[in-house]
């Protein structure tokens, strides 16, 4: 009786809490981001749920990464897993499609047209009318179970559901098994896409009796069986012709060892009450959304905010089963202990804003994320970079699980871990930072990543430096001074790629690459250009300002960032969207930049710019995101900015104040306290802070701290249409991120080219500027000395070769150089290699190569330096959408017996071998005779990056050799870039 009384009281309390919550679901539009390039999906998910049940309207292409695009007119069916806002495609598992009449397993035949006017998308619920069948499809879910409700027309036509396991990704293996007695179908699907071996089991049950199941393998019907297996398995499930409605519940398991193991997850839905599951999902969403309450009369702003908050609560996804079992990175099944395990960690995006937001309002899940990271380290030897369903995709850069761990530690989330466990976290950080890949060895050796060793070298250097700062701070907190000293030095390596203008500038062969255009999007940056990456020094920004020349210079650079032309050059990069000047809000590298004015005493400019971004680049419409949602990062930026502050440097516990968007916002903290933010006089035109109070006391700092928030309080702003240029300005009022120099900046070896005919003169300089006035810099620095060698030995202070001026060489030479400072010691040693080659022939190019892929100029094809398999390192001339044609002049008539040309194929990157190469020879450059033809034998859909030499061996006498290579042409339908023009990549022409 007592237990019953307690249960009744608990139910009453739950009901009271539910009634007390505001119905915030009504303000969410899951269709936001499904148009333009947002890459979101509109279907049903519960907060951070392991099932994402949503319609699939697109099978291929970049804008089909989530399987749904608002511009599409047909639905192929409803699959149970989807990615939100990613730039790569995966998931779309276990597709169901209801039908009436004649059924087919061919997707072009069973798909149906639909109309957005008959479509409803809400948190935890989706419905649409399938025009072809006149069937109403409704979807809802629990964390592990997708629930469908199909309402059929009242006729006597055949009715049923198509199950398609071939849908979208390459299938490695699949099984469909029918248990007639249990009215149940179970199966599995192993597939390959972004995750090269994703495993998923399913168990589905039906509210109506199955009358018949037809099995299909390779789209051919297989009779008299109850189960099928293969790489193309489908089934047609029939119900009675008078069936009016069917509810289907589909449980998923990524940990299953046996075919029926997903059954245990069906416990979440013990019956077929669709309404109850829908109501539960709705309440779960209201509970999450009520963590932040906003007050405003602007309904549009309220919709934008709560849709953004909704997207923040969709990923990462729950990965373990109801019993805690999950599949690890080692492919084995493990048991989670006192935590949940999650998947889909888009950390290059989400460490910036999503994880800091969750560390503030969802400490329990943040703890689970750190627990998950450590399981990855135990099972895979490293912390995750971009993990997807127990698979490290190696997508994007950095080791950004580290700032998530450090930020959690700073906020006390990891206090319950033992000292030993925290030390293991530090060990995991160090091990991940020192992996022998992705330019990390070169970064440690040279103090930056040379672009001729690793692509995206500038971005990687900058992001590694920030992550290393996080490692250093964590080591310091744990009393590990040796680790601190090592990584605090590494965190200043950004200085080694900074040029005189303050731009982060790629370096190769010991010096800065030239020509250089900060607007050029190229392989030295990750989905960006130098404008968008140059201010990325969040942990030491004020030192960066000093090196640039002071606050006045920094202000001009920031003003130019937002005020210059939005035109970019170089590679077409679909991710670079939402441009304001060269600031690209549609991608992550510059998300912090609008807040940097606070660091130089101009917070009113931050207020103006953040308000402009919020109002111009976010709406409540399907195209309401200006770029990929990126698993919550794009929305988290908005949520935090609407609060009025943003974590420029995750882990330092500072929030940089921008412009609060709402009249009142209440953050309901997990400890029961509330942090309330008010903005008196706020309107769409009044974005400027006039004054502020924190807990009733005058507040004139342009930042707040975690300690100001964690126990609740009030932050009250008074807003105006005019800026108060004095508020938040002053040494003690503005944020400052700087620490003492602990490294000596490396020198730069400067030469006009790497190869030469007779002699070459190079110089060596230090590129650290010295400020002599507010506007003038002396270059190079005069406080350091440079030592160098030209015989390949390591330079040292006692070397006789202290650099004093230009040096001329006449032979192949390896130059090594080091700079020295009395306070900070030696810099890392850098090196450059120069080659003398016999210029016994010249080349005339009849095709124009892409500016991005010049390999150093016209003579690159004759310089004796061959391009590598990784085309991003340079060394290849690229020709897009055209044939390659050139004429070689041997300078005299000669006997030859061999002509060879090197070509590259990297199909994923649109680089495909030419279909053929034709060579002609001539003595007078007028009358040419055929020399030979080479026909390509490698398939275009061979995705292995490879180099082939097209060679023709035949005696001939000539002076001129004309070479023509035929382009593959337009990329076919099977390619992700279908319809685009392929590239020819060529390097090194040999004549013997």
Features from the language model and the residues they span:
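Accessory carbohydrate-recognition regions in carbohydrate-active enzymes
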Residues: 21-355, 359-403, 409-462, 470, ...
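Beta-strand signatures of extracellular beta-sandwich domains
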Residues: 691-693, 785-789, 918-920
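Bacterial Sec-dependent N-terminal signal peptides
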Residues: 1-21
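Short acidic/polar inter-strand loop motif in beta-rich domains
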Residues: 723-726, 822-826, 967-974
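Aromatic, loop-rich ligand-recognition surfaces of beta-strand-rich domains
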Residues: 868-932, 944-992
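Extracellular Ig-like/FN3 beta-sandwich strand-entry sites
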Residues: 245, 712, 810-814, 958-960
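Exposed aromatic-hydrophobic patches
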Residues: 235-238, 804-809, 945-953
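Short, compositionally stereotyped local motifs that mark structural "simplifiers"
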Residues: 20, 737-884
């Amino acid at each position: 009786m007592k237990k019953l009384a307690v249960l009744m009281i608990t139910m009453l309390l739950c009901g009271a809490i539910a009634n007390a919550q505001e119905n915030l679901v009504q303000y969410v539009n899951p269709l936001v981001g499904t148009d333009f390039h947002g890459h979101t999906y509109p279907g049903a998910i519960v907060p951070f749920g392991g099932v994402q049940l949503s319609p699939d309207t697109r099978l291929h292409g970049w804008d089909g990464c989530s399987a749904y695009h608002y511009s599409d007119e047909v639905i192929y069916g409803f699959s149970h897993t989807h990615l939100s806002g990613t730039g790569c495609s995966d998931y779309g598992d276990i597709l169901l499609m209801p039908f009436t009449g004649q059924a087919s397993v061919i997707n072009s035949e069973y798909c149906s047209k639909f109309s957005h006017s008959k479509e409803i998308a809400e948190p935890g619920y989706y419905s649409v009318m399938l025009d072809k069948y006149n069937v109403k499809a409704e979807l809802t879910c629990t964390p592990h179970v997708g629930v469908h409700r199909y309402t059929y027309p009242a006729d006597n036509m055949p009715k049923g559901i198509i199950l398609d396991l071939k849908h979208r990704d390459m299938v490695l293996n699949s099984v469909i098994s029918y248990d007639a007695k249990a009215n149940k179908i179970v199966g599995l699907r192993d597939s390959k896409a972004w995750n090269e071996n994703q495993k998923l089991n399913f168990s589905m049950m039906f509210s109506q009796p199955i009358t018949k199941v037809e099995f299909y393998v390779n789209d051919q019907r297989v009779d008299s069986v109850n189960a099928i297996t293969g790489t193309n398995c489908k089934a047609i499930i029939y119900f009675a012709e008078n069936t009016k409605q069917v509810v289907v519940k589909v449980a998923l398991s990524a940990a299953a060892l046996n075919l029926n193991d997903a059954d245990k997850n069906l416990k979440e839905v013990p019956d077929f009450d669709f309404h109850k599951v829908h109501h539960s999902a709705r309440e779960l969403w209201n509970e999450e959304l009520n963590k932040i309450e906003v007050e405003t009369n602007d309904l549009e702003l309220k919709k934008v905010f709560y849709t953004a908050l909704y997207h923040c609560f969709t990923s990462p996804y729950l990965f373990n089963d109801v019993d805690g079992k999950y599949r690890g990175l080692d492919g084995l099944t493990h048991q989670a202990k006192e935590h949940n395990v999650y998947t889909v960690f888009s950390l290059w995006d989400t460490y910036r804003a999503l994880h800091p937001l969750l560390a503030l309002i969802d400490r329990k899940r943040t703890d689970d994320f750190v627990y998950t990271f450590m399981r990855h380290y135990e099972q895979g030897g490293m912390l995750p970079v971009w993990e997807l369903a127990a698979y490290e995709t190696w997508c994007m850069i950095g080791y950004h699980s580290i700032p998530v761990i450090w930020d959690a530690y700073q906020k006390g989330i990891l206090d319950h871990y033992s000292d030993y466990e925290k030390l293991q976290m530090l060990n995991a950080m160090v091990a991940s930072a020192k992996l022998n890949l992705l330019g990390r060895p070169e970064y440690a050796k040279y103090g930056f990543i040379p672009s001729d060793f690793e692509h995206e070298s500038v971005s990687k250097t900058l992001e590694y430096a920030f992550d290393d700062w996080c490692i250093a701070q964590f080591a310091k907190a744990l009393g590990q001074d040796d680790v601190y000293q090592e990584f605090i030095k590494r965190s200043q390596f950004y200085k080694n790629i900074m040029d005189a203008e303050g731009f982060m500038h790629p370096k190769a062969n010991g010096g800065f690459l030239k020509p250089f255009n900060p607007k050029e999007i190229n392989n030295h940056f990750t989905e960006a250009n130098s404008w968008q990456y140059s201010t990325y020094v969040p942990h030491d920004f004020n030192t960066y300002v000093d090196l640039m020349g002071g606050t006045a210079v920094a202000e001009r650079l920031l003003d130019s960032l937002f005020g210059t032309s939005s035109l970019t050059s170089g590679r077409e990069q679909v991710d670079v969207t939402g441009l304001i000047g060269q600031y690209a809000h549609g991608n992550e590298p510059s998300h912090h930049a609008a807040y940097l004015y606070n660091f130089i005493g101009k917070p009113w400019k931050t207020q103006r710019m953040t308000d402009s971004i919020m109002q111009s680049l976010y709406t409540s419409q399907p195209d309401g995101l200006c770029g990929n949602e990126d698993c919550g990062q794009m929305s988290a930026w908005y949520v935090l900015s609407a609060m009025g502050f943003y974590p420029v440097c995750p882990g330092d516990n500072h929030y940089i104040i921008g412009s609060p968007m709402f009249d009142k916002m209440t953050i309901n903290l997990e400890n029961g306290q509330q942090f309330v933010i008010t903005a008196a006089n706020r309107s769409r035109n009044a974005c400027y802070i006039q004054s502020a109070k924190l807990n009733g006391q005058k507040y004139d700092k342009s930042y707040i701290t975690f300690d100001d928030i964690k126990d609740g309080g009030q932050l009250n702003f008074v807003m105006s249409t005019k800026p108060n240029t004095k508020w938040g300005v002053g040494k003690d009022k503005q944020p400052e991120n700087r620490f003492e120099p602990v490294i000596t900046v490396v020198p730069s070896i400067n030469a006009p080219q790497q190869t030469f005919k007779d002699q070459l003169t190079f110089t060596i300089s230090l590129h650290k500027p010295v400020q002599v006035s507010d506007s003038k810099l002396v270059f190079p620095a005069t406080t350091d000395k440079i030592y160098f060698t030209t015989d390949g030995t390591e330079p040292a202070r006692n070397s006789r070769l202290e650099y004093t001026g230009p040096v001329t060489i006449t032979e192949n030479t390896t130059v090594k150089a080091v700079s020295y400072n009395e306070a900070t010691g030696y810099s890392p040693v850098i090196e450059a290699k120069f080659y003398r080659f016999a210029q016994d022939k010249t080349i005339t190019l009849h095709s124009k190569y892409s500016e991005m892929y010049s390999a150093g100029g016209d003579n690159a094809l004759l310089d004796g330096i061959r391009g590598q398999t990784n085309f991003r390192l340079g060394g290849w001339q690229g020709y897009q959408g055209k044939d390659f044609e050139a004429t070689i002049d041997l300078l005299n008539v000669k006997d030859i017996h061999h002509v060879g040309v090197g070509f590259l194929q990297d199909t994923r990157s649109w680089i495909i071998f030419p279909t053929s190469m034709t060579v002609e020879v001539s003595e007078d450059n007028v009358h040419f005779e055929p020399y030979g033809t080479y026909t390509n034998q490698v398939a275009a859909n061979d995705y292995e990056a490879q180099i082939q030499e097209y060679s023709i061996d035949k005696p001939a006498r000539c002076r001129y050799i004309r070479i023509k290579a035929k382009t593959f042409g337009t990329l076919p339908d099977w390619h992700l870039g279908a319809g685009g023009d392929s590239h020819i990549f060529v390097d090194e022409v040999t004549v013997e």
